[in-house]
Design a protein with these regions (language model features):
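Hydrophobic alpha-helical transmembrane segments and their immediately adjacent juxtamembrane loops
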Residues: 233-330
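Peripheral, non-transmembrane regulatory/ligand-interaction domains of membrane transport proteins
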Residues: 1-215, 219-221, 227-230, 234-237, ...
């Protein structure tokens, strides 16, 4: 599915017909943005003609758009630059299948045009597109401004994901400190997988953005270099934040193990107290279980002897409980 936005005769035009887009582009437009959402990783015939015949993009670049690899890429050609960058668009089950939330955005950028190609529906591109329709003089005042808006949204997706992870980790920490359960460890490991997957893709993204910070590239005007350096700095900051989260998840595992150890110690302490209390009871019951006549039998009789034995047991239990409480053993 294709959609395009550009200026024609002083007014903004949106178009979804590839042939009409090609016709208007050949009339030397000042700036055009074409967005192609691939269905089943395939280009339609009209889209193929647009990319190969109208823009004359290299077939290897087009092939890279059809088969995402989750590695950034910048390739410089005679009349354009091809790139592939990656961001995160969280899905409902992202904690179990985080890789499905990672998208690849391919782009062709040259003098007066930007072509974006992706295999998944990217909502942030729709937002930028609608803003460009509503405020074309602001959002599409230059190629650099349009490209910056796209890059900024991609990099910001990492920050949004980190906020989600922080909320999850804070909740886990509270649960662990209150009452650690086996399910908490499963959640920690799922979070760890998400963080390490983010780190894997984020570390390599800087190599793509650094190209647009160089003063000797032919695409970005000097006054806009500072914007793309901001993108590069933001990406570097995200990398450091992700590295910090990897350290935090290790600390969270240590907190869980410590909490489990404390909980186990409390259980063992309780069981030890029970066993210690029962021990004198067993001794007394074993003593009175012997088939002999005890001296107190002649004083208390059969019933009295039973109460005498039970009394010794109760007094022993109470005395031990008072002693344990005084020692703060439970």
């Amino acid at each position: 599915m294709i959609k395009a936005i550009y200026f024609k005769n002083g007014s903004v035009v949106t178009e979804r017909d590839a042939l009409k887009v090609a016709e208007d582009y050949n009339n030397k437009l000042d700036l055009i943005w074409i967005d192609i959402h691939l269905k089943n990783h395939e280009l339609t015939h009209q889209e193929t003609v647009l990319l190969t015949a109208t823009f004359r993009f290299h077939e290897m670049s087009i092939e890279d758009c059809l088969f995402p690899q989750y590695y950034p890429k910048i390739e410089e050609f005679e009349n354009y630059v091809f790139g592939a960058i990656h961001g995160i668009q969280l899905k409902p089950n992202y904690y179990q299948e985080f890789e499905d939330s990672i998208y690849e955005l391919n782009f062709f950028v040259g003098k007066g045009f930007l072509v974006t190609v992706h295999t998944e529906e990217l909502f942030f591109l729709e937002t930028i597109f609608e803003r460009a329709k509503a405020r074309p003089q602001v959002e599409m005042k230059s190629l650099e401004n349009l490209l910056y808006n796209v890059f900024n949204k991609v990099v910001s997706s990492y920050e949004f994901t980190l906020e989600k992870i922080d909320d999850k980790m804070e909740g886990l920490e509270d649960e662990i400190l209150e009452d650690p359960e086996a399910e908490n460890m499963e959640d920690i490991l799922d979070t760890k997988k998400v963080i390490f997957a983010m780190r894997k893709i984020a570390e390599s993204q800087q190599a793509a953005y650094v190209y647009f910070t160089r003063a000797n590239n032919n695409l970005i005007a000097r006054e806009y270099l500072v914007y793309f350096r901001d993108i590069y700095t933001q990406c570097a900051r995200m990398n450091q934040a992700i590295i910090m989260r990897t350290q935090m998840i290790v600390s969270l595992i240590e907190v869980y193990m410590s909490s489990v150890t404390v909980k186990l110690t409390e259980v063992m302490k309780f069981l030890t107290v029970i066993a210690t209390i029962v021990m004198p009871v067993l001794i007394v019951s074993g003593y009175y279980g012997m088939n002999v006549v005890f001296p107190e039998y002649s004083f208390f009789g059969q019933k009295g002897s039973w109460f005498f034995a039970v009394g010794i047991m109760l007094i022993t239990i109470i005395a031990m409980l008072v002693y344990f409480k005084k020692k703060k053993w439970f």
